């Protein structure tokens, strides 16, 4: 009843807490205050971890989870299953105390920054919406991805054959060095091409897009890259993220990760 009542709920990365509680049948209702979001709004270029904020804003050194937990199965994961209850209890109590202290400081700073209206009317209301989206997940049909991957793979093979036929010899299109040597050394599309600090020719998308009108092979190379990215980043990768429990992908949405304000998706 307390978590579903009208009292303000304060947390650091509160979205994570909402999802954990919801997975255990507890639906937390607002109002909310997230110290991580507050600091990210007023100081976007700085680190927003609780340990850092405690040092900078409270002049307090917190208990570090890495000092009491064991390494997890995955990189950057920590396993707390073997931590004694009294040790974990002290860590958790400090976590709650520091979050409350940080909220008092950050509420004042958000107000002084002139961004309180933005924070209260846009960022905080968005938080539970994103938590719901992450918890619900995105339905994905693996068989559809597999069919699309085969189709795009055929397009990639066709583009590779056409490019190598036009070049007159085999060409590793995934090697920026080979590609640069071919376009600027062999074809000499530009008299004074740009080079990287290591001396290689620059072959990024902007450079090739500007050269596309000069030679049809450049347009094919751009199309090859676009389809390769589609296949490797999405069609072949997404099935690995499907949760076996419900057949959905549960990503993480970040509302403060980009300077432009757009949502960023991770995992």
What are these regions (language model features)?
Residues 1-31, 99:
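RNA/tRNA-interacting regions in translation and RNA-turnover enzymes
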Residues 2-4, 35-37, 114-115, 145:
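A short, structure-level motif marking secondary-structure boundaries and short turns
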Residues 7, 40, 50-53, 65:
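C-terminal structured domain segments across diverse proteins
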Residues 7-8, 62, 226:
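Generic structural signal for secondary-structure transition and capping sites
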Residues 11-12, 30-34, 64, 173, ...:
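General beta-strand structural signal in soluble alpha/beta enzymes
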Residues 14, 22, 45, 53, ...:
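Conserved "right-hand" nucleotidyltransferase catalytic core of DNA-directed polymerases
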Residues 17-21, 48-50, 62-65:
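Switch/connector loops and helix/strand junctions flanking conserved nucleotide-binding motifs
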Residues 27-43:
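Conserved beta-strand -> loop -> alpha-helix junction used to position metal-binding or nucleic-acid-contacting
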């Amino acid at each position: 009843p307390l978590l579903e009542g009208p009292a303000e709920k304060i947390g650091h990365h509160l979205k994570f807490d909402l999802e954990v509680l919801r997975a255990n049948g507890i639906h937390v209702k607002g109002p909310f205050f997230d110290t991580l979001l507050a600091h990210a709004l007023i100081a976007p270029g700085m680190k927003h971890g609780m340990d850092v904020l405690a040092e900078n804003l409270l002049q307090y050194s917190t208990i570090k989870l890495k000092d009491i937990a064991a390494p997890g199965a995955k990189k950057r994961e920590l396993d707390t299953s073997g931590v004694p209850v009294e040790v974990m209890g002290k860590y958790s109590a400090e976590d709650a105390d520091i979050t409350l202290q940080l909220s008092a400081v950050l509420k004042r700073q958000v107000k002084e920054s002139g961004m309180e209206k933005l924070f209260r009317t846009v960022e905080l209301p968005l938080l539970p919406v994103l938590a719901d989206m992450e918890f619900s997940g995105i339905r994905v049909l693996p068989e559809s991805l597999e069919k699309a991957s085969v189709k795009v793979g055929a397009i990639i093979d066709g583009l590779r054959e056409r490019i190598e036929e036009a070049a007159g010899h085999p060409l590793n299109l995934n090697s920026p060095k080979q590609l640069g040597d071919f376009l600027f050394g062999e074809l000499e599309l530009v008299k004074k091409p740009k080079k990287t600090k290591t001396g290689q020719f620059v072959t990024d998308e902007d450079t090739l897009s500007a050269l596309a009108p000069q030679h049809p092979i450049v347009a094919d190379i751009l199309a090859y890259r676009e389809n390769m990215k589609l296949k490797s980043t999405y069609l072949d990768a997404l099935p690995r993220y499907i949760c076996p429990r419900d057949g959905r992908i549960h990503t993480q949405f970040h509302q403060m990760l980009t300077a432009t304000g757009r949502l960023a998706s991770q995992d």
